[in-house]
Curated annotation (Swiss-Prot):
Its main location: cytoplasm. A zinc finger (B box-type) spans 91-132. Residues 186-199 are annotated as: Required for interaction with GABARAP and for autophagy. The lineage of its organism: Eukaryota, Metazoa, Chordata, Craniata, Vertebrata. It is found in: Cytoplasm; Nucleus. Can form homodimers and homotrimers. In addition to lower-order dimerization, also exhibits a higher-order multimerization and both low- and high-order multimerizations are essential for its restriction activity. Interacts with BTBD1 and BTBD2. Interacts with PSMC4, PSMC5, PSMD7 and HSPA8/HSC70. Interacts (via B30.2/SPRY domain) with HSPA1A/B. Interacts with PSMC2, MAP3K7/TAK1, TAB2 and TAB3. Interacts with SQSTM1. Interacts with TRIM6 and TRIM34. Interacts with ULK1 (phosphorylated form), GABARAP, GABARAPL1, GABARAPL2, MAP1LC3A, MAP1LC3C and BECN1. This is Tripartite motif-containing protein 5. GO terms for cellular component: nucleus; P-body. Belongs to the TRIM/RBCC family. GO terms for biological process: activation of innate immune response; autophagy; defense response to virus; innate immune response; positive regulation of canonical NF-kappaB signal transduction; positive regulation of MAPK cascade; positive regulation of NF-kappaB transcription factor activity; protein K63-linked ubiquitination. Pathway: Protein modification; protein ubiquitination.
Length: 494
């Protein structure tokens, strides 16, 4: 409302010719006012007859001597210029909306800027008021403090927002990892079940072939027995149907032969002696698989090192070794090179590697304490594979004899009244439900343990050496024995 009044006042004190605030205003008899310069310049165009002029707005004539200065309008214009009428927003700020006066005072109680008329009104009577200039700096400082506070809060809000986004991303990753783990766990279960199913079916097929083979043999025996009896029957019938001479000729031998005939019953296979299928312990199998997965985290890159170039056949990539026979030049005797070491040597930490022994009928592998132990030129016999000699190994002999080699055991023999003491290596039989095509070896140097896993059978523990005495660096050990098929170091993703 106040700004509209100011606009109206401005229109009243605006020159109709130049459309600016009146400068040195002159008023005519008709009541219209113009800038002195504007109305003087308009004299020539508005002359109607000599000595008279006309108003540019209403065209009423006026004598030139009747132009008079309007001091009242000049004062109004001066006041308007002080108020700075041009920006309307400025008018709203600087002028009181109720009274149209300049806002020069600040009411402390209401916290508002007021004019001098507001100060005298009933609404603000008794309030503490100050000039705007007096309190502006104080409140500017207060607002600056509040501004800094809000900027800090804005930073905190942005950080909270970022934290939420980060937490959201973290949860997404965590959930995705959980999904991946769940899928991996169930895939592992399915793989285990598939493997167990395949093994059970293979065992059944082997059992079927074995039983049917023996039954076929039994059937053949029964056929031969039946044929033999048929021959005797035919002989008896011929004698009975023939002459007396044919009847009596060798009759005692025939009767004796018939009486000695004993029916051989076929071999039977009792169901109760069959291997009974039992549902596998999935929980236990999964735990075993997890243990294998855990030790596989310590997979080490192992290469093979021969003790002498001519005594072992090692592949170019130093990942495969096979048996080689060689003849000693001086003695002409056949020598065998059984073992090679792996590199690097191990003096601390946890290490894991896997060896492919598929289709081999003999092998020995594990850990050896030194080159001197491994490179036995005469070929290490079974009696040498003992922890006290620096070997922690397991092996296969004669295609189906799996064993772990422990320290020798003392025996006391009494012969002819005398006592003798002998030492024999302790060979621990290892029973495999599934023959390992791939064997994992895990060495924990600080825990002094060497463990062997049947990777082919979902990672079941084959054997574990505990309380091992590692006083020197140890090496992976590989012996292809006398089987010509190779032993191959596996890569992690093979």
């Amino acid at each position: 409302m106040a700004s509209r009044i100011l606009v109206n006042i401005k229109e009243e004190v605006t020159c109709p010719i130049c459309l600016e605030l009146l400068t040195e205003p002159l008023s005519l008899d008709c009541g219209h006012s113009f800038c002195q310069a504007c109305i003087t310049a308009n004299h020539k165009e508005s002359t109607l007859h000599q000595g008279e002029r006309s108003c540019p707005l209403c065209r009423i004539s006026y004598p030139s001597e009747n132009l008079r200065p309007n001091r009242h309008l000049a004062n109004i214009v001066e006041r308007l210029r002080e108020v700075v009428l041009s920006p309307e927003e400025g008018q709203k700020v600087d002028l009181c909306a109720r009274h149209g006066e300049k806002l020069l005072l600040f009411c402390q109680q209401d916290g508002n800027v007021i004019c001098w008329l507001c100060e005298r009104s009933q609404e603000h009577r008794g309030h503490h008021t100050f000039l705007v200039e007096e309190v502006a700096q104080t409140y500017r400082e207060n607002l600056q403090v509040v501004l800094e506070m809000m900027r800090q809060k804005h930073q905190d809000a942005e950080k909270l927002e970022a934290d939420v986004r980060e937490e959201q991303a973290s949860w997404k990753i965590q959930i995705q990892n959980d999904k991946t783990n769940i899928m991996a766990e169930f895939k592992q279960l399915r793989d285990i079940l598939d493997c167990e199913e395949s093994n059970e079916l293979q065992n059944l097929e082997k059992e079927e072939k074995n039983i049917l083979k023996r039954l076929v043999q039994s059937e053949n025996d029964m056929v031969l027995q039946t044929q033999s009896i048929s021959v005797l029957i035919s002989d008896l019938e011929h004698r009975l149907q023939g002459s007396v001479m044919e009847l009596l000729q060798g009759v005692d031998g025939v009767i004796k032969r018939v009486k000695n005939v004993t029916l051989q019953k076929p071999k039977t296979f009792l169901n109760e002696k069959r291997r009974v299928f039992r549902v596998p312990d999935l929980k236990g199998m999964l735990q075993v698989s997890k243990e294998l997965t855990e030790v596989q985290r310590y997979w080490a890159h192992v290469t093979l090192v021969a003790s002498h170039p001519s005594r072992a056949v090692i592949s170019e990539d130093e990942r495969q070794v096979r048996y080689q026979e060689w003849i000693h030049q001086s003695s002409g005797r056949v020598k065998y090179f059984y073992g090679v070491l792996g590199s690097p040597s191990i003096t601390s930490g946890k290490h894991y590697w896997e060896v492919d022994v598929s289709n081999k009928s003999a092998w020995i592998l594990g850990v050896c304490v030194s080159l001197k132990c491994a490179a036995n030129r005469n070929g290490p016999g079974v009696e040498n594979y003992q922890p006290k000699n620096g070997y922690w190994v397991i092996g296969l002999r004669n295609a189906d004899n799996y064993s772990a080699f422990q320290d020798s055991v003392k025996y006391n023999d009494f012969q002819d009244g005398s006592r003798s003491t002998t030492y024999a290596p302790l060979i621990v039989p290892l029973f495999m439900t599934i023959c390992p095509n791939r064997v994992g070896v895990f060495l924990d140097y600080e825990a002094c343990t060497v463990s062997f896993f049947n990777v082919t059978s979902n990672g079941f523990l084959i054997y574990k050496f505990s309380n091992c005495h590692f006083s020197y660096p140890v090496f992976p050990y590989f012996s292809p024995m006398t089987c010509e098929l190779p032993m191959t170091l596996c890569s992690p993703r093979s």
